[in-house]
């Protein structure tokens, strides 16, 4: 397996584009994105667990109930959530795009992201769709820009892998900077692949993957109303269709996880106002479920995130987060270390503090990528979670979000 360029356009038969249609006031910001497969594709998606859901999620869930999609359209700048005519607008988006592409509206995935509770005018979207379609090409980067809101950096990746000797490709783009605390999904992620796989197995692969990828990311503890992870697989690589849990399925799942885990790191690193990527690696839990609970609890602790912003090796906040996590843990067996490119330092052993150099700890924690290593020493369960530090700028960004 190797990383390649191309994002969602790396896989055969996929093209993309992003334009400014006028939803956002800033004319330099793209606010409408499209991903298109030249043939119908197997499709699957997972959705936010927030009880308040954006209208596009309802429409998308209905559209891909048959496991088929051919295009994805997404606007940024308006969430189309809590609007009386939200479903109607989302359906209109799919119908307008389908007419321009000459495909079925039922084969369109619809997404929106932005401010909640503001009416979404269909006019700029309708006006922008012809240019969006006309400009289709190898423009994964433009589609990526079109789904961004408070994101500072675009997020895309693609990898190449082999299934039974056939070269396949899978790529993805993501949006996510704030309201990141998934239970799936709380971010927008769009994945494409030319691997031939049934809709049933595609859904199974995605559902399992998010447990250890996007559901293990947190920026601010807020679960969004709108976001989802979707995937289209058009089969143009020409491999034998993956229809069961076999070696080929395992290979596909590994490639998918390479893409999703990379996007997870990018989302966490680009958290609103963030200066540091935090990666919490838990080993030795009684099982994987307990490991995930501990890792997510630590990465979600506002006190711990603030300590990381200040490069303060306050390991007590780690133990505190472990203690209230609800995981089955022997706190007297817990070890904690911090690691970065500047080295590694142990700050806690068997649930108690150990002598360490505060100066060395600060040097380690001043880096932009920090690993929190937690050994529970109670079993074979492992997990990793991603997050970021909590800074002054997070409050500034969200205090001014609607302005």
Where are these regions (language model features)?
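A structural signal for small-residue-enriched, beta-sheet-centric alpha/beta enzyme cores
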Residues: 1-88, 92, 98-403
């Amino acid at each position: 397996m190797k990383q390649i360029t191309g994002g969602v356009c790396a896989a055969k038969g996929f093209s993309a584009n992003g334009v400014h249609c006028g939803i956002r006031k800033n004319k330099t910001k793209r606010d409408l994105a499209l991903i298109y497969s030249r043939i119908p594709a197997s499709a699957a998606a997972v959705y936010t667990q927030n009880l308040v859901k954006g209208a596009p999620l309802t429409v998308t869930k209905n559209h891909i109930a048959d496991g088929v999609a051919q295009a994805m359209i997404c606007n940024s700048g308006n969430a189309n959530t809590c609007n009386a005519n939200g479903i109607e607008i989302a359906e209109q988006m799919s119908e307008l795009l389908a007419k321009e592409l000459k495909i079925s509206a039922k084969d369109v995935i619809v997404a929106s992201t932005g401010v909640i509770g503001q009416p979404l005018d269909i006019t700029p979207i309708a006006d922008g769709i012809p240019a969006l379609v006309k400009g289709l090409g190898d423009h994964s980067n433009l589609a990526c820009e079109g789904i961004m809101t408070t994101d500072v950096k675009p997020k895309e990746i693609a990898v190449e892998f082999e299934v039974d000797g056939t070269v396949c490709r899978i790529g993805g783009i993501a949006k996510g900077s704030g309201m990141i605390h998934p239970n799936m999904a709380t971010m927008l992620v769009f994945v494409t692949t030319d691997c031939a796989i049934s809709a049933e197995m595609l859904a199974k692969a995605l559902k399992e993957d998010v447990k250890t990828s996007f559901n293990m990311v947190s920026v601010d503890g807020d679960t969004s109303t709108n976001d989802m992870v979707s995937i289209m697989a058009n089969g143009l690589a020409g491999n034998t269709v993956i229809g069961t849990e076999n070696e080929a399925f395992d290979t596909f799942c590994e490639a998918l996880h390479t893409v999703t885990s990379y996007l997870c790191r990018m989302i966490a690193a680009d958290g609103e106002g963030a200066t540091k990527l935090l990666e919490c690696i838990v080993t030795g839990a009684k099982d994987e479920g307990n490991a995930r609970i501990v890792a997510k609890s630590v990465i979600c602790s506002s006190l711990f995130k603030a300590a990381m912003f200040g490069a303060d090796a306050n390991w007590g906040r780690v133990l505190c987060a472990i203690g209230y996590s609800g995981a089955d843990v022997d706190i007297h067996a817990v070890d904690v270390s911090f690691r970065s490119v500047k080295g590694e330092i142990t700050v806690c052993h068997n649930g108690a503090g150990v002598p360490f150099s505060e100066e060395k700890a600060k040097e380690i924690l001043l880096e932009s990528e920090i690993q929190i290593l937690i050994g529970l020493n109670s079993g074979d369960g492992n997990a990793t979670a991603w997050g970021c530090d909590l800074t002054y700028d997070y409050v500034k960004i969200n205090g001014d979000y609607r302005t």
